[in-house]
Amino acid sequence: MLLALLRQHIRPYRRLVAMLMMLQLVSTLASLYLPTVNAEIVDDGVAKGDTATIVRLGAVMLGVTGLQVLCAIGAVYLGSRTGAGFGRDLRSAMFEHIITFSERETARFGAPTLLTRSTNDVRQILFLVQMTATVLVTAPIMCVGGIIMAIHQEAALTWLLLVSVPILAVANYWIISHMLPLFRRMQSLIDGINRVMRDQLSGVRVVRAFTREGYERDKFAQANTALSNAALSAGNWQALMLPVTTLTINASSVALIWFGGLRIDSGQMQVGSLIAFLSYFAQILMAVLMATMTLAVLPRASVCAERITEVLSTPAALGNPDNPKFPTDGVTGVVRLAGATFTYPGADCPVLQDISLTARPGTTTAIVGSTGSGKSTLVSLICRLYDVTAGAVLVDGIDVREYHTERLWSAIGLVPQRSYLFSGTVADNLRYGGGPDQVVTEQEMWEALRVAAADGFVQTDGLQTRVAQGGVNFSGGQRQRLAIARAVIRRPAIYVFDDAFSALDVHTDAKVHASLRQVSGDATIIVVTQRISNAAQADQVIVVDNGKIVGTGTHETLLADCPTYAEFAASQSLSATVGGVG
């Protein structure tokens, strides 16, 4: 998976990689040539007292060193550019794919693990790419070239290489095989600690209200300890790599000096050749060490690549059709459900069964029912946040699955049950409601705020009023009104309010509804509500109970003909005042 991921996202940087490899090749060859020049200086210059030879070879050595340094600097620069571009592209690919996920895929992975995979996991692979860019050509050429040059200097001592290099390779392979499962567990534990942190931060009010700080502290401590223990185990194995490598290099160097000294003493070898052989021996083992350091990063990067590939290979449940359809004259807003049935993945029974209804332009359809009856799920089907299991949802006679999702959603102004606001300003949040090509003016923003009765509390700082993440610096009612204003900005063909007035007082609720009726024109309005006062004003009321429609009509007819609705109205003590029925 790692190789496939690298091959896919490194393709745009092939020219940079080719230039990088060329510079590394020149730099490595220059490094391999230096010990030979050094040996000639010792044997032909120093040993014979030939100053001219020393100066001449010294100048050559200086020139080769300068070339090696320049090429190395260029290779590092190109490697950094390649790594940074690769990381940027991979993060973008993750983001672009994740935003296509429906609620089903998002719930399957969970927000904490998606955040970890998009940031920490990408960073681990980026680190591998940057290290690989450094040793991509250097390590193998230095190793092979070093062996060739060492044999050229003194073939009789090459048996030391045949012993030390395999020992080093086998030892490091043994260590890495133990590190791989530990890194896989670490990434899972990082997801867990992010999940705990996110729960605590999101539910800080609940934690304090129920004085559960101690419990949350213990839960975080458990997750933190588990991650620390896994990291310690992985770190212990990783820490073995350097001592094992250092021990092998030092032991081999001692053996080389010992046997080389014996050959010099017997006149079979010159001092310069021993110095050169030592240099090549060090370069060979350094190449192995560089490869080892890369291999040390490889297990964790492999695990991260698996996790990233899992996300990227997960198809979005709500894909676009090959030949999308769209009404010739634009969306007018006729919404029809024909035998719509929906079952959540893994559930034993459907949450909605055989739902059929029609909402027409210029009318308001209220959907009422008890908690858990399936009202919000019904709205999700209309907005195509989920696809029906059976039946169909049609907008202007076209199945929503045959629309391009962006064109469908651009015709819908949704105010969800949880009125989420993005960090930034009020103006930034209102612009979210604009269409793809719509330029939202300040006048339109203030008009939308007026419709939602939100202009009063933003009057002080105006449209530049700061909004914290999630809108936590506003009350629940203020968040709902800003979310309503965001939907109004678009002037959509279909308004969908999913219990969007629950935090408003009766007076503000009535004011907002009156303003909406004025600006909605021929738009279709669908309101999910728990308030009979809201349903009473609708042109059509749909009563949902246990996933089925048990009543359709106006407020007055349902009070007389639908026991479920009558009971619902009686529980709010509104039937007598609104419907005239006791």
Curated annotation (Swiss-Prot):
GO molecular function annotation: ABC-type oligopeptide transporter activity; ATP binding; ATP hydrolysis activity
Gene3D superfamilies named in the record: ABC transporter type 1, transmembrane domain, P-loop containing nucleotide triphosphate hydrolases
ABC transporter domain segment(s): 335-571
Subcellular localization(s) per the UniProt record: Cell membrane
Domain ABC transmembrane type-1: 17-300
One Pfam assignment: ABC_tran
Stated name of the protein: Uncharacterized ABC transporter ATP-binding protein MT1311
Species: Mycobacterium tuberculosis (strain CDC 1551 / Oshkosh)
